Amino acid sequence: MDQRLDPGLSPYRTFTRAEWAQLREDTPMTLGAEEILRLQGLNDRLSIREVEEIYLPLSRLLSMYVGATQKLFRAMSQFLDHRNNAEGKMPYIIGVAGSVAVGKSTTARVLQALLARWPHTPKVDLVTTDGFLLPNAVLQREGLMEKKGFPESYDLSLLLRFLTDIKAGRRPVKAPLYSHFFYDVLPDQMVEVDRPDILIVEGLNVLQTGRPPRDGKAIPFVSDFFDFSVYIDADEDVLEHWYVQRFMRLRETAFKDPLSYFHRYSKLTEEEARETALSIWHRINLTNLRENILPTRQRANLILRKAGDHEVAEVQLRKL
């Protein structure tokens, strides 16, 4: 029997960049050139054209999704006689997933900026799952420092409790803060999330699930709390190149600070630094991508596929 999948059976509809750009229609551009520059991540590229052709159509799509979800929630509240939520509001949660160095943070920040300009969703918060990593002291004790960013390196129960409280409409809900400068969770430092209209959750493994239990008991996954999810995709060799580029730039900037966790790398020669970056990529990040991140790609509602120039070349939207 031929096991090849008929393209017509794919759960996704694929758009070229030009086809996707046409879906913007009359969605207004609400970001200026200076703001776009501020939203751009280190070693990422974000242009006005990218916002117009990729993110404005996505903004329009999400506007429809959020509106439909809010309408359904109001109908359910009436059906249940408003017993579930006294204020008639439930945050819409968007997950953003993808590899290290793919540009997740830039995408999340652009979406936050665009969605916050909708008249019906003025409050949009952004939380990264980095804050839910186990502290370095715990990772070292458990022998997991080489697995940082892998599923087992997160305080999953804390993350699930955070998302449960958000969906339940509790206020305010606190999330731990992470410092890339110190490469650790910041003790006793939290960010408050106070009943946003939309919450964007960005992280490596946010779409991951596990094996269902044999006893049939319900086990929640992070993605169970998402109303919509985006996966940022790129080829492995492209991701490797971007990661090394970013490492080399950090070597000349943040790593030079004596207080930086990675200060030792600033003293390497250029060749030594490049070899170190490649070693970290292959030993940790590529392994995590292949074993844990990439297998979750097909669980996303939308896949943004990037080319080597950091621009989105193709969009895949899950069929309803």
UniProtKB/Swiss-Prot annotation:
Keywords: ATP-binding, Coenzyme A biosynthesis, Cytoplasm, Kinase, Nucleotide-binding, Transferase. Pathway: Cofactor biosynthesis; coenzyme A biosynthesis; CoA from (R)-pantothenate: step 1/5. It comes from the Bacteria. Coiled coil: none annotated. ATP binds at G98, S99, V100, A101, V102, G103, K104, S105. Its EC number is 2.7.1.33. GO terms for biological process: coenzyme A biosynthetic process. GO terms for molecular function: ATP binding; pantothenate kinase activity. Belongs to the prokaryotic pantothenate kinase family. This is Pantothenate kinase. It comes from Azorhizobium caulinodans (strain ATCC 43989 / DSM 5975 / JCM 20966 / LMG 6465 / NBRC 14845 / NCIMB 13405 / ORS 571).
